[in-house]
Amino acid sequence: MIALWWDEARQYNVLPLDDRGVTLFGIRPGDHGPHRLDRNYSYFPPITRIPTAASAPIGGRSWDFVAHIVRPAGSDGVLYATGTENSGLSIFIQNDLLVFDYNYFGEHWVAESTRPVPEGLCTVGVQFRRAKRDATVTLLINGEPSGDRHLPRFMRMMSSVGASVGFDDGSPVSDRYTGPFPFCGLIKRIDIRIVSQDKTSEQEANDATGRSIQARQ
């Protein structure tokens, strides 16, 4: 039976076998795919949910987020979200403040800006910096720091369901709003930049991303 299996494998071009597992599903930056060599991602709404395999791989990594928006008076809503009610993160404007909600498996660590988001054309941002086991989040309005929060832990695998721009698709990541909570202003562009880190941390994050993508197959 074993010999027959190998004969059939050769006949139907199954060989060579590849047992690399999650490595095959990890992020491989290149010029002809969704993951550029410079690790920069730009999104121009309106767009549908971005699959995990194509979205910015922020799980387990340090990253910068900048949203270029035009905000009418009193407009709220989600700018970027990834995950579900079980885990993930959401960046949104609520009650004139920029809010970052990090949903760590049902435990919400929230940062709010120390000053209101201005009306009209402006930028709002988030800097996420991981350490070995914890992380720090800094909120920015027009490039100026406006609040921060220490996270005692961070998730290496952020989401297996992808990301949403301008709304929160699926079950809400944050418990501070219901439904998709779409942003009522104009999102001109969202930029996410993956910050370089040591090879060990990068491999850990890449393997976690691979497991997330593999789980969706």
What residue ranges belong to the model's regions?
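Extracellular glycan-associated modules
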Residues: 16-217
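Sec-exported extracytoplasmic/periplasmic mature domains
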Residues: 6-10
